[in-house]
Amino acid sequence: MAKWPNVPHCYGWLGLDARGHWFMLDDRTQALGSFASGAAGAKGSRLQHEKLIDFIHRNYTCDDSAQWFFQNGPQRVYVELEATPFVWRVGADFSVTAHTGQPARPQRCVVDEHGRVYLDTELGFGLIHTLDVPIAAEAVEAGLWVPEEVYTRDLPTRFGYIRSPQQMLKTLQK
């Protein structure tokens, strides 16, 4: 890293959607609206290259300001989150795996006003993949997870993450 001491961080170019897919956001895409806005075309292009996705997964982490990024050599590429920093897959045995492939142990279950189910784990906070909500319901019915209700707007503050590092940067620069 000392070889490239002044490499600027990258904001607004990478997004993680609510299903655990990565998206590249070029200038044209960014001009259409924020990644999480739902505006047509604002999500950008879904990454398909498996080795690139694996590289992102291996280097995906959080800074001291609760902003998620992946370390690309000397540069941090900050991630725009559609929902949460992690997207969980739940196995039939109620095992939990992050979109990054890492196993996780649920510590808390949360349900928002829209019925979306989240887990807080030792890795961090994340949304359960929509395809796995029926399995999550079984875990709740079995008493393995006891959900608490929370409003979507309160999730980032309560669980310590920034959904849009790019927007935070713009706010700080004003």
Question: Model regions: which residues?
Answer:
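Surface-exposed beta-loop interaction hotspot
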Residues: 84-107
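Short, exposed beta-strand/loop patches in secreted or surface proteins that constitute
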Residues: 15-16, 59-61, 86-88, 106-111
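Short, extreme N-terminal leader segments that mark the start of a protein/domain
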Residues: 1-23
